[in-house]
Amino acid sequence: MDNYEYIVASLPVLRPEDSRSDNVNAEALIAEIREQLSGRDQTVLDQLLAGYDDEQLTEDFYRQILRHKNRFLREWFRFDLDLRNATVGYLNHQLHRAPDHDKILLEEREVEEFPELEAAERILRGTDILQRERGLDELRWHKVDEITLLDYFDLETLLGYVAKLKIIDRWLQLDPDSGRALFRRMVEEIRTTYDNKKQNITI
């Protein structure tokens, strides 16, 4: 059995006080997490990471991932698909294209409410491109927190951290200051989460 508690506890001390962009390497942190997982869990992690390759984001990918046994993968990529479709839908409206142009619509998927739709559309209406990207990533960040809210020391917790590391990695490239700030934010969240959940378990 994987020692998820040990892995989670070790995350804050990997690079806890880094302040220079060349010292914050999200991909290296993900690789360190992966090395500590079992082969089965590595496969699940790889499926999460596949979702960051635009060439793999096909109907078949979403069809399979939305039926995955892992709860984090199912909920995360349901949100991801809805957010992508909302973004495409907004652009279609702005460009006077057909509403469903370039959307990924799964025929077998039941119509579901997208709770973040209003927030996403409000962000997309912004005129500052960087602020729009930051706003959408804030939605993603909060979704990770929502999905893993009741998780303790398990694979879902680690997948959530990796999803946040991917957000950090993107901002280290777009805006290094924002990337470093997000990294420090995640370190503090890990510390707080670990302390709180450890206390809850021992009570």
Predicted regions and their residues:
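Extended alpha-helical surfaces
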Residues: 1-203
